[in-house]
């Protein structure tokens, strides 16, 4: 059933953050930072893939995603819902079910040849495709999926994620320059606010996380490993 009532954005963000904290998808470790794929340190880590194992929370968040898309993009904005391999696939299927639309997924690498070599499922020329993923940091990884969709002759002007970092100011501009609008449920700032309200982490940890969120580049530069090729 297509939802027709729209909870306030702030309430969606707060409840999404609360659910992520409840299933322990959120990790704060400023004293022993995580290492990102870029090699840079981060005191924060989030695992949205855990959501598929919590049916009640998963269902609620997909309802939130559906109403966010209907409110912000429109009731007849899409013809096809595409998940990005791998994390986006289950969420794309759930969103497609709620919106009553076909579902496909986009491979990271091509399989075979032709303009549909990265697409699994039926995607046709002229379709308006929504790209669904679990999260985005700076938006960069989404562009490859968008390009693969457009190579089929379909259009892709929107991407939706459960979690958007919300700390790198270039993200929205990068996506907009590629003709893509980002839709999301919550950010690190929403998680930080809910973590403070619930007492999920100690005050010192939250203060250090806030320092990172306020200026992630400076925080990382101060803590990134020394270059072993440089002599003392």
UniProtKB/Swiss-Prot annotation:
Enzyme class name: transferase
Binding-site residues for orotate, renumbered to this chain: 137
Keyword Iron-sulfur in record: no
Highest taxon in the source lineage: Bacteria
Family listed: Belongs to the purine/pyrimidine phosphoribosyltransferase family. PyrE subfamily.
Biological role stated in the UniProt entry: Catalyzes the transfer of a ribosyl phosphate group from 5-phosphoribose 1-diphosphate to orotate, leading to the formation of orotidine monophosphate (OMP).
Catalytic activity: orotidine 5'-phosphate + diphosphate = orotate + 5-phospho-alpha-D-ribose 1-diphosphate
Native organism: Cereibacter sphaeroides (strain ATCC 17029 / ATH 2.4.9)
Protein's pathway: Pyrimidine metabolism; UMP biosynthesis via de novo pathway; UMP from orotate: step 1/2
Cofactor(s) needed by this chain: Mg(2+)
One Gene Ontology biological process: 'de novo' UMP biosynthetic process
Pfam families: Pribosyltran
Enzyme Commission identifier(s): 2.4.2.10
Disulfide bonds: none
Residues where 5-phospho-alpha-D-ribose 1-diphosphate binds: 107-108, 111, 133-141
Keywords annotated in UniProt: Glycosyltransferase, Magnesium, Pyrimidine biosynthesis, Transferase
InterPro entries: OPRT, PRibTrfase_dom, PRTase-like
Cross-referenced PANTHER family: OROTATE PHOSPHORIBOSYLTRANSFERASE, URIDINE 5'-MONOPHOSPHATE SYNTHASE
Record note on quaternary structure: Homodimer.
MF GO annotations: magnesium ion binding; orotate phosphoribosyltransferase activity
Protein name (database record): Orotate phosphoribosyltransferase
Key word Transferase present: yes
Coiled-coil stretches noted in the UniProt entry, renumbered to this chain: none
């Amino acid at each position: 059933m297509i939802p027709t009532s729209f909870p306030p954005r702030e309430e969606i963000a707060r409840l999404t953050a609360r659910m992520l904290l409840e299933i322990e998808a959120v990790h704060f470790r400023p004293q022993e930072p995580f290492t990102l794929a870029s090699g840079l340190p981060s005191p924060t880590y989030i695992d949205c893939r855990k959501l598929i194992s919590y049916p009640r929370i998963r269902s609620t968040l997909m309802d939130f995603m559906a109403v966010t898309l209907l409110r912000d993009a429109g009731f007849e904005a899409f013809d096809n819902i595409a998940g990005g391999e791998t994390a986006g696939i289950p969420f794309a299927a759930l969103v497609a079910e709620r919106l009553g639309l076909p579902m496909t997924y986009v491979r990271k690498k091509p399989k075979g040849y032709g303009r549909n070599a990265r697409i699994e499922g039926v995607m046709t020329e002229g379709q308006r495709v929504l790209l669904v993923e679990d999260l985005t940091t700076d938006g960069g990884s989404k562009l490859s999926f968008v390009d693969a969709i457009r190579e089929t002759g379909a259009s892709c002007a929107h991407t939706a994620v459960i979690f958007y970092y919300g700390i790198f100011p270039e993200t929205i501009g990068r996506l907009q320059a590629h003709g893509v609008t980002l839709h999301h449920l919550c950010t690190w700032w929403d998680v930080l606010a809910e973590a403070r309200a619930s007492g999920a982490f100690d005050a010192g940890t939250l203060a250090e996380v806030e320092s990172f969120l306020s200026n992630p580049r400076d925080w990382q530069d101060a803590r990134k490993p020394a270059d072993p090729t440089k002599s003392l």
